[in-house]
Amino acid sequence: VTDPRTIPSPNIWHWPEIYEAENLAQDIDGNIPRYLRAAVPWDGRVVVDVGCGTGFHLPDFAADASRVIGVEPHEPLRAAAAMRVAGLDHVEVVAGHAESLPLPDSSVDLVHARTAYFFGVGAGPGITEALRVLAPGGSLVVVDLDVSASPYGDWMRADLPKYNCSAVEAFFEAQGFALTRVDTRWEFSNRRTMREVLGIEFTRSTAARAARSIPGLDFDVRYRVHVRRKPAGIELA
């Protein structure tokens, strides 16, 4: 059962099949996992994916991690994630929220969240909770869209005119995160799928304008990757 306090994520909640196609199209060149493996390697370590949805990223972590835990509050997505990793004995999917992870203190090495919960101001309780479950020397990684970069950011700002990119980045900086921008490319197999994906991410008018502006089957999308490490020892001023 989904906790009634959970804030819906309308795209993946209502159109999981289209969102799966979106996941398959995103970062087709693998730039984000390439960066993450260099910045926060998880070989032989314990990884938690907060807001894992249908578990799309769990197998990637499972290839090298000793244990992977997907945390997802929405029951239908949780069931889909569990089905996806059914053959992986060291992967489990559990119910939970970013603000109340069902894990012991200092029990994991990497907490990962991609376009989930950690959107800026208001994410403080989740950051505190992540630091609780992280072992000393572990890392919290937040991956989100860079709304300042064209063309995807232009479409987002059209639908979210009050979104303040600078304020969001300042929030994470104040919380002790280091920021890296990662350029990626989304590529689709056909224009129908591309239009469907744009249709679940934007208003009808913005999605139509975006589709008209794309001559082919791909476009650039930049991400922000915020990393905060938990000190391995006493943190001196």
Residue ranges and their predicted role:
Residues 45, 66, 109:
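Conserved acidic residues
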Residues 99-111:
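A short acidic, Gly/Pro-enriched loop at the edge of an enzyme's catalytic core
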Residues 124-136:
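A short glycine-rich, Lys/Arg-flanked "PGG" loop and its adjoining helix->strand segment in the class I
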